[in-house]
């Protein structure tokens, strides 16, 4: 699964916090509509819902 796949199934109200694997500082935070193009095709290692509209994503 890639960030693009998450974008297809997300809604406009969801906020994504994206981390590189092993990093403690996020590389992106916001709606996937504004995700940088260099991240959109990256493979997702895992993701989890922090609450109804906030999703934490870890990239490979």
Where are these regions (language model features)?
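N-terminal acidic leader/helix
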Residues: 1-24
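Detector for the mature cores of small, proteolytically processed
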Residues: 20-60
């Amino acid at each position: 699964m890639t960030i693009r796949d998450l974008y297809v199934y997300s809604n406009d109200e969801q906020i994504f916090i994206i981390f590189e694997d092993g990093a403690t500082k996020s590389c992106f935070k916001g709606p996937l509509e504004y995700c940088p193009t260099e991240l959109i095709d990256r493979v997702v290692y895992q993701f989890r819902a922090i609450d109804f509209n906030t999703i934490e994503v870890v990239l490979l």
